Amino acid sequence: MTVNDVTFTREVEPRLLLIHFLRDELGLTGSHWGCDTSNCGACVVWMDELPVKSCTVLAAMADGRRVLTVEGLERNGRLDPVQEGFARCHGLQCGFCTPGMMLTARWLLDHHPDPTPAQILEALSGQVCRCTGYENIVRSVQWAAQHHGGDGRGGHRSAPEEAG
């Protein structure tokens, strides 16, 4: 599988979940393992440019696929507008839900560059934030939309490099 533009080849135990592969095998701990029931959305990553809850995907199912985690959002040392929006507009408190929220927001902006607050809330409806109201999260996504948020990041990835 290719994760954040780096190709990895590993043998995995057949029941290993993608979230555990990313965190335990690759050391990519930005994605969080939350509810273990596919309800909270803290584990959202992209698989072939679609948001998926990585606690519901076997690592083996990602073979030959492209995976994007929150660590892969920044480019050339610059934060993605979604990441910057969450920081500037106080879209997080504890931060546990934030990686999944950011990846879902990035997908939304890539497909709807100027979403309404209702569209933002609908896109994020599969994710739970227990700390904040969603007002600052919506503001964060709106900020990103106004600052080159729909930059097509998902469709313009560089060629993957090889890793062990």
Regions found by a protein language model. Give the residues of each.
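Signature of N-terminal electron-transfer/Fe-S-associated modules in redox systems
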Residues: 1-164
